[in-house]
Amino acid sequence: MMNTLLEKGDEVICVVPGYQQFVDIPKSIGCKVRLIELDEYDWQVGVKKFRKMMNTSTKMIILNNPSNPTGTEYSIDFLNELIEVCKPYGTYILCDEVYRGLNQEVSISDIYENGISTSSLSKVFSLAGLRFGWIKANEYVIHQINIRRDYSMISTGPLVDKLGWIALKHKDELILRAKNIISTNKNIVREWLKENPRFECVLPSGGTVCFLKYYFDLKSEIFAKLLLAEKGVFFVPGSCFDKEYYFRLGLAQDSKPFKSGLDELSNFVDEHLIS
């Protein structure tokens, strides 16, 4: 999508912390990437920050809704305000909606002519191995994508098509399964946080990940490697998102190993970080 619509010299606005490719791909094309930081206390952002950055060179705003790694979910009011900011410039809003369906129901492509929605079976459907996804946008954008596709993947394989069709046919059951797992694990996190005051987390209303903050003087990559080596528990370190003293916590696994992993994190802290 970015390689199709963006050109060297275009300006792109990205929200951070966020998915690395949203920043690095435009940079590789030669775009000027401007960053807007989410507020740490609630992982939200106001439209005013976007308005200040907009100009005639702003080709695209890139969002993840809900966000990876924070779980941020943008409201319909926020999206409508952002659309009004973008309209005078014809700016695209590219929104990765890979977690859509758990809670967030508004798709940017349904409410904005230059809105582009991308999604896949990787997250909510737990079928990342299929590498199956889709794009929804206006006719011009889809036509440009089809032209580029002729020089890359051409089409998906018939087996992937079939398995994807089966998954989508049973989407209600699969989404309900995901909702139940995540709801249970969020409750586990809430109880765990009560017993571990040196950690805090804004639990998301949507999505399958959250950003766990810790209050120890230990860089996140070192912390993650030590924890993995000693306890066999892995978190994505916040340094991967240019945000130290955080871990990305995935909420979508079976509850028993999920709780066990948090308990091992507590044990590691008790053994090494609390004197």
What are these regions (language model features)?
Residues 52, 217-218, 225-235, 241-275:
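PLP-dependent enzyme catalytic core of the Aspartate aminotransferase-like
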Residues 29, 88-89, 196, 231, ...:
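Helix C-cap/helix->beta junction micro-motif
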